[in-house]
Structure formats: structure tokens, C-alpha cells
């Protein structure tokens, strides 16, 4: 009798384990589901199409991509494949955790500063690494506990075009990251910057920027607009002004910038203000071409454990 009970117990445990494994596998499969975006695609299941004062032909592409990013947040992650074409983005698109975005050859993500919508104003950003559901909340993230495991890459020639947008008091930035970890940006051309940066990197850990090109600018008043800006979320310096941060002055840690081209810019990479005793650490820049930058190549303010390898610097413009 004892032997039968033991066999039954082992069998029950085995069946339960198999059920749990199957459940986990299904959950992982669901999280990794792929969705394809095209220039003419409507929002997921018609979401936002009846939003009067918001949805129109100018905002359609924005709401289409936004609806799928919101879907991926609910599903715990997944992949967006963005097909060839031009996508005009008037407002910020928030990217949640465990998301991969593949930009196909011929994709242009273009910043526009108009909506033609009565209830919706344009904003200066394009992408931000933050859960869409937390976009309007205050102080939700600190340290490196925000959105994680994000990859944005191109399989060919894809462009994020800031179109020289922005003005005093309203920076235009292609990608904002803060309180993030495990982020990869690869194979993308960023172009046409004014009043801002291409990448604003604050309080982020384990970031890899590889095989990207950063090019083109119109002069800002301060002449220190870096293509990639390393900063801290600090209320005193106001280097980061997004309310969802806890403003804990967390620096960046373990950043690798490799095989990139920086040309015709004010500055390639750097930090132009700092938080006291908060050091960006383990910063590696290798095999990059830096040319024609007005205010210099790399500014290492409050950096520790820095590695510069095989950089090539060419002719500097004078402002």
C-alpha cells in the first residue's frame, strides 16, 4: 500500500511539473509573439480610431505603433517588425520591457511637430524606454529598476530622422533612456539634430550602441549638443526633466559604444554637467570614426574606468 502511495505521489509530482513546464512554455511563446507594422496599418483592433480630437491622418501611424507597444506591455514583451516606409511621429512612443524592434531596410522614422488634432499637442521625443501605462505617473522608477531587455536594430539601412525639430525649452531626442538596463541599439542611422541629442542616456546599465551612424545638426545656442549624452536624473542640474524618474542622480554603468560613425555634429559623445560624487563607470568606446565635430569628440566629465580603443579623429570644423 505504501509503495502504491509513493508511486501515486511521484506520478502526481511528474504530471504537475509537466503542466507547469507547458504553462511556462506557452507564456514565453506568447511573450515572444511577433507583430508586423506597415505604413498603412491601423491601430490594433481599431483602438483609438474613434478618439475624436486625437486620431486623424496625421496621427494615424503614431497611434498604430503606440497600440502595438501597449499590447506588448500587456503580454510581457514581444517583437515588432517595422516594414519599409516612412513613419511620421508627432508624439512620444513608449517602449516596455522585453521588447525587440526590428527596422527593415528602407525604414525612416521621422519626427514631425504637428498633429492637426484639437486635443493632442506634439512633443519633442520619438522613443522613450518606459512602460506606456506609466507615462503620466510621477516618480515611478529609480536606480536601474525601470524598463529592461530592449533591442532596437536594423537589418539594412534604417533611419531615425529628427528633421532638425526642437526649439529653446523643447529638445528633440530620438531615444530617451533612464533607469533602464540591458539595452542594445544597433545598425541605425540617426540624423538631423537640433536642440537636443540623438540618444539621452541616464541612469542606465549594460547598454550597447553598435554599428550606428550619427550625422547632421543645426547649431544650438550652447554648442554642446552631444549625439550621445551621458547624464544623471538630477533636479539640480535639470539634465533630465521627465517626471517618471525619482531623480536619484543614478549614473550610467557599463556602456559600450562600438563601430559607430559620428560626423558633422557639435559633439559626438559626452557629459557637460554632473551630479556630485556620481560617476559614470565602465565606459568603453572602440573602433569609432569621429569627424567634423564643432565642439570636440568626447567629453568625459565624471567618468571612471574608461576605455578608448582604435578611435579615428578627422578634421574639425570651427564654429
Where are these regions (language model features)?
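Bacterial N-terminal signal peptides that target proteins for export
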Residues: 1-10
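Bacterial N-terminal signal peptides
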Residues: 11-19
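Short glycine/acidic-rich loop motifs that flank beta-strands on beta-rich extracellular proteins
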Residues: 88-92, 111-114, 162-166, 171-173, ...
